Amino acid sequence: MVNAKEVKKVIKENGINTKKISVRCSIEGYEEVIRVTLKDIYLPLKKIEAIVRKAFEVVGYDEYSNEILAGGNTFVFVEYDYNIYEEAVNAKLEEAEAKLKELKNQPVTYGYELANKGNLVIYGNKETDQIIITDKTDRSKRSWYNINKYDMARALLALETA
């Protein structure tokens, strides 16, 4: 069975400080589960997830139905600490309200650029009440429907921490 020290060692070997990372390893049913919790919103979640999955994740699939086979799998879950994430979202609420007002006052109904960082852009769509984060190749990364100030704050945070 994998232990938390091994997981942290692999993360550290890839140049990431592990002081604000919590790791829990457990056996649930016939499966091993590795849960990594990031306690800093600026830690690279996708990169850490890729590192841990490459090193430890093992999932067996049925060759015909492609269903996950029971037993012997190791699943990896990486997420931000809920309280820290919500604090960061709440810190973006004022900016989010301003962006929603900006979108509402635009004559453009589809594809209005609200914010950008590097190759990522947040577009607003008044017609479908949607915001989308895409890259410069127009591949959608995330989207929110029936948007409110919290969704906009989450989008702004996702853009900032990308």
Question: Over which residues does each language-model region extend?
Answer:
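Short, surface-exposed ligand-recognition loops at beta-strand->loop->(often short) alpha-helix junctions
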Residues: M1-K5
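Acidic, low-complexity, intrinsically disordered interaction modules
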Residues: I41-K101, V108-Y150
